């Protein structure tokens, strides 16, 4: 049985990301086992590395790390271990893996981005039109 694993720091955004991840995994394979765990730290890449090693030892096939810099440590350790990972908040392929020039890039499935920049840009544009 395939196992996916999601890590998250405690934030409302993180919980929404994880719900979507779980629903997508179950839609793809109703028998899939999804495991969710929390780091309770958003700025500790070393903790993310330790977390990744622990969840990989539990058999995770895909790791979705919603945990800021802590998640960076989780994703990097996961991909270096030749397991699949999904990043969050920025395009990890460029920001973490140098456009594919860093080992492990081939195990990065995707990155989930909120694109708040688009919302801010649109709001400023709308406000400027109404002035």
Language-model segments: what does each one mean?
Residues 1-131:
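A residue-level marker of the well-folded mature domains of exported/periplasmic proteins
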């Amino acid at each position: 049985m395939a196992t996916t694993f999601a890590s998250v720091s405690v934030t409302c955004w993180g919980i929404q990301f994880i719900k979507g991840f779980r629903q997508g995994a179950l839609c793809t394979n109703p028998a899939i086992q999804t495991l969710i765990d929390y780091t309770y730290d958003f700025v500790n890449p070393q903790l993310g590395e330790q977390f990744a090693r622990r969840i990989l030892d539990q058999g995770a096939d895909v790791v979705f790390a919603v945990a800021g810099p802590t998640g960076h440590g989780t994703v990097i350790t996961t991909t270096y271990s030749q397991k699949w990972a999904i990043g969050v908040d920025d395009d990890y392929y460029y920001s973490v893996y140098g456009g594919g020039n860093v080992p492990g890039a081939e195990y990065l499935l995707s990155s989930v981005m909120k694109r708040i920049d688009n919302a801010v840009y649109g709001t400023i544009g709308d406000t400027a039109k109404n002035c």
